Amino acid sequence: MRRLKLMATFLMLFLFRMSVCAQTELVYTPTWTAQAQFAGFYVAEAMGYFKEAGLKVVIKHPTASNTNANRLKSGESHLVSLQLASALEMMDDGSQLVNVLQYFQQSGLMVISRQPLKSLNDLNGKRVGHFRTGASMFVVAIGRKVHLDIDWVPFISHANLYLSGAIDATLAMSYNEYFQLKAAGQRLKKEQIIYLRDIGYNVPEDGLYVTKDFFKNHREEVLKFAEATRRGWEWAAQHPKETLDLVMLYMRQNNVPSNVYAQRWMLEECLKLLTDPKTGKRTYRLDPQAFDLTSRILYEGSIIKKPITYQQIMQP
C-alpha cells in the first residue's frame, strides 16, 4: 500500500513538472540516458526536494550528438554530472568548472579479460575495449605511465565488442556492462576480473559540476540544488525498493528500454559507490587525496597537459 501511494505521488509530480516546464530556471543533465545511476536526482525531483528549496528544475538527458559536456559549454544545461576524469579533461581544455557535490566516492570501474589477470601488466599486447571518455581514460593513463603496449578500442556503452570476440579484454562499470555480460551468459571467474578500487586506484567518479561563472552568479541556487540532490540520494539509500519503482517510471517516460533486474543491480551497485571507502559513510565531498591521485595519474599518462589542483575545482 505504501509503495502504491508513493507511485501515485510520483505520477502527480510528473504532471506538475510538465505544467511548469516553460518556467524552468535550472536545467540538469546526467551523463547518459535515464537509469538508476541518477536515482538521487530523480528522487529529489519526485519527492519535491527541489521545489521545497524554491527551485524549478528540468532534468534533460543527453543524446549521442549533444552530450552533457556540450550542453554545459553551450549553456543549454546549468548543472551536469561528470566523472572526475572527464571534469579534469574539460578543465585541461580550458573549461572552468566547480565541483559542488561528489556523490560517488568510489570507483565502479573494472577490467574483464578472457584470460586470467594478475595485474594490469597482463594487458600488455592485448586489444582492450574502453569508453571514449570518462573514467576509462584513467586506465589508459595508467597503461601509458608504465609503458604498456595496449591496443585501445573505443566504444560508447555496451558489452557487444567483448561478446563478439573482437577484443581480448574490456573496461566495464560494475553497475552496467558487468551485468550485461552476466546477463548474456558469460560465466566470469574471479581471476578474469580486476576492480580498480582493489589495486590502489579507488578514485571517485560521478559528481555534480557547474561552470565557475554560473556558480559565481547563482551560488545560492546551485548550493540549494546540491543539498536537494544529497537529500535525494539519502532517501534512495533508505528506500531502495521505492526508488527502483521511480527509476523505472523515469525510464518509461523517457522511452528508454530496460528491465527491472538490470536496474535493481545498477541501483544496488551505485548505492555502494556512495560510501567513503575509509569511513563507510556518505560524505558527498570530494576527497583531496583521491583527487590528487586522479589528477597526477592523468597528467603522468599524458591525458591532461598540466596538473590540476584541488583548489581549482572546489568552490571559490
Functional labels for PLM-detected ranges:
Residues 23-155, 159-175, 194, 202:
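Short, glycine-/small- and polar/acidic-enriched structural segments
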Residues 217-301:
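Secondary-structure end/capping motifs
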Residues 1-8:
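Bacterial N-terminal signal peptides that target proteins for export
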Residues 18-22:
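Sec/Tat signal peptide C-region and signal peptidase I cleavage site
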Residues 8-17:
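Bacterial N-terminal signal peptides
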Residues 85-86, 157-161, 165-256:
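Pocket-lining segment of extracytoplasmic ligand-binding domains
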Residues 294-296, 300-316:
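Hinge/cleft segment of the Venus flytrap/periplasmic-binding protein
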Residues 45-48, 53-54, 76, 81-84, ...:
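Sec/Tat-exported extracytoplasmic proteins
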